[in-house]
Design a protein with these regions (language model features):
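Loop/turn-rich, solvent-exposed surfaces of beta-rich toroidal or solenoidal domains
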Residues: 309-310, 321, 363-385, 389-394, ...
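Structural signature of eukaryotic scaffold interfaces centered on beta-propeller domains
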Residues: 37-48, 95-102, 110-111, 153-185, ...
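Start-of-domain marker
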Residues: 24-92, 253, 299-302, 312-317, ...
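Bacterial Sec-dependent N-terminal signal peptides
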Residues: 1-28
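Conserved blade-ending motifs and adjacent loop-strand segments that build the rim/top face
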Residues: 85, 272-290, 338-358, 408-429, ...
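Post-signal peptide N-terminal segment of secreted/secretory-pathway proteins
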Residues: 42-153, 176-184, 191, 201
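Beta-propeller blade signature
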Residues: 67-75, 120-132, 201-212, 254-266, ...
Length: 514
């Protein structure tokens, strides 16, 4: 699991639609008396739905605090716990996630207007013990001078910047440390000296639960502008830490898979990564899209780690995708590529760089890593914003590959043109049947052929045993009412309908036909 994986899962997409079918409901405004601030789904470490959390605000309660309340619902929408708490005044709202300790973490969204700019500090996360329904500020640590320092008060941003500038003047660099609590027990700490244009004196350390050092792994000790090493962790388990090591020698780069023993800190395996551009290997562990979305691009199985990235032929253009598999027994690495031009039998006008007709290009929306070894790639036809034109999206395109990453088919889901809200139509996905199959959801605003009226439609697309089935829920207009879809328990979707003016904010589970 990546260290930032859970946070990368915090905020779900939403869209504006209206709905006319009645179902089992829960009134969010009746669950607490405060102002409703946020609602989101909660997932466990296996990405299974745990339930939902709804957050409410009561305004300023002190010079540096605000009063909030949380309500936890199970996946059947039954309220199971609630409590009022004091949060930092610079928190505007909280979203929730379940960490590997099975604690519910409330992660804040900063409010930069709550205090004067020179007094602003980043709000702290809150930690809820689900077994006792108790809440406290989440404990964070800094590491400096060979010891852990508990962060009890958030540091003023302006003062922190002054300290950094003073340290840079004195030493010529800033000392940086990052502390992560890990599921395998204890802590992982990164430390290094940051000179601005380069770093050196890198150290990766592991500590036990009592903060005793178990091992230290030093690298890039003498790094400078011309020669340096950089290591990115992309996975870890009870046995190993998996990293991509990049070495720079003047203007030349080389890349390696470097596996470090979790228990001893020694290098277990090093495998050169070759045959691809520097840009491809640099970005193999993460994927960003032109419409400003990051995607989860890997999945860990019992015997392997699979990831798919863009295959770059220059700094700014890619000609398709590259799949990398790490064998967890031998640590051997294998690559396979899929090029945009391989899609020509299905998309005749596609270019080598993924462009289509009228300036549209294929923009990534999701990856699906199935148990049989195949990978599905979901994309949307996207046109970037011009000087005098809005960004636009149209059809969704699903690319099938087999276990060897060979193209096995393409399916196009025709969709009306959307302007501006280019991240709003594709919603989310869920694995089905223990990862063998998948379902994904998108919306579309369509005109009725007879009445000529435009209505929102929700499309539920299941891929089971390699075959697609689509269910469509037609939406009726209801002025000024919004509906936000969320992940529901398997076989259901949760719809939240609200209108702030009418003080209407309800959720309901809708049964799906799969």
């Amino acid at each position: 699991m990546k260290f930032d994986y859970l946070q990368a899962k915090l905020f779900l997409l939403f869209f504006l639609i209206s709905f006319s079918v009645f179902a089992q409901t829960q009134d969010l405004l009746a669950l607490a008396s405060g102002e409703h601030l946020y609602f989101n789904a909660l997932f466990d470490q296996d990405e299974n739905l745990y339930g939902y959390v709804s957050v409410y605000g009561y305004g300023k309660s002190g010079d540096k605090t605000r009063k909030f309340e949380y309500v936890i619902l199970d996946k059947n929408l039954n309220p199971v716990a609630h409590k009022e708490f004091e949060g930092d005044i610079t928190a505007s709202l909280y979203a929730g996630y379940i960490d590997f300790n099975k604690k519910l973490i409330l992660f804040p969204k900063p409010d930069h207007t709550a205090v004067r700019s020179k007094e602003f500090f980043y709000p702290r996360s809150m930690e809820i013990d689900l077994s006792t329904n108790t809440i406290k500020p989440k404990t964070y640590y800094e590491y400096e001078n060979n010891s852990f320092i508990e962060v009890t008060e958030p540091k003023n941003v302006r003062d922190a910047r002054k300290e950094n500038k003073a340290e840079k003047r004195e030493k010529g660099y800033n000392y940086v440390s990052e502390v992560y609590e890990i599921e395998e027990g204890g802590y992982i700490v990164f430390e290094y000296n940051d000179y601005g244009k380069y770093t050196n004196n890198q150290n990766l350390m592991r500590f036990d639960e009592d903060k005793n050092m178990l091992w230290s792994f030093k690298y890039n000790e003498d790094g400078d502008k011309k020669n340096s090493e950089f290591m990115r962790v992309f996975e870890h388990d009870k046995n190993y830490i998996y990293t991509i090591l990049r070495k720079k020698n003047n203007k030349d780069f080389s890349f390696y898979l470097q596996v470090i023993d979790m228990n001893t800190g020694t290098v277990t395996a090093t495998r050169p990564l070759t045959g691809f551009s520097d840009e491809t290997l640099e970005a193999i562990t993460f994927v960003y899209t032109d419409s400003y979305r990051s995607l989860d691009n890997d999945k860990t199985f019992d015997d392997k780690i699979v990831m798919v990235g863009k295959n770059y032929n220059s700094m700014f253009t890619s000609d398709g995708f590259v799949r990398m598999i790490v064998d967890k027994k031998t640590f051997d690495v294998s690559f396979r590529t899929l090029h945009y031009q391989d899609l020509k039998p299905y998309l005749p006008k596609i270019t080598a760089n993924g462009y289509l007709e009228k300036g549209y290009k294929l923009e990534l929306r999701d990856f699906f890593f199935l148990e049989d070894g195949s990978v599905g790639i979901l994309m949307e036809k996207y046109k970037a914003q011009g000087s005098y034109s809005a960004p636009k999206t149209t059809d969704l395109v699903y690319v099938f590959t087999d276990k060897d990453f060979n193209l096995s088919g393409v399916k196009v889901f025709e969709k009306e043109k959307t302007k501006w809200a280019v991240n709003a139509d594709y919603l989310f996905s869920q694995y089905l049947n223990d990862g063998k199959d998948v379902v994904f959801f998108y919306r579309d605003l369509q005109k009725d052929d007879e009445t000529k009226e435009k209505n929102w439609n929700l499309f539920i697309n299941t891929l089971i045993d390699g075959k697609f089935n689509q269910e469509q829920i037609q939406i009726s207009e209801k002025d000024n009412y919004l509906i936000i879809p969320y992940v529901g328990k398997e076989g259901y979707i949760l719809l939240r309908e609200f209108n702030k003016k009418d003080k209407y904010n309800k959720i309901r589970l809708e049964r799906l036909n799969y």
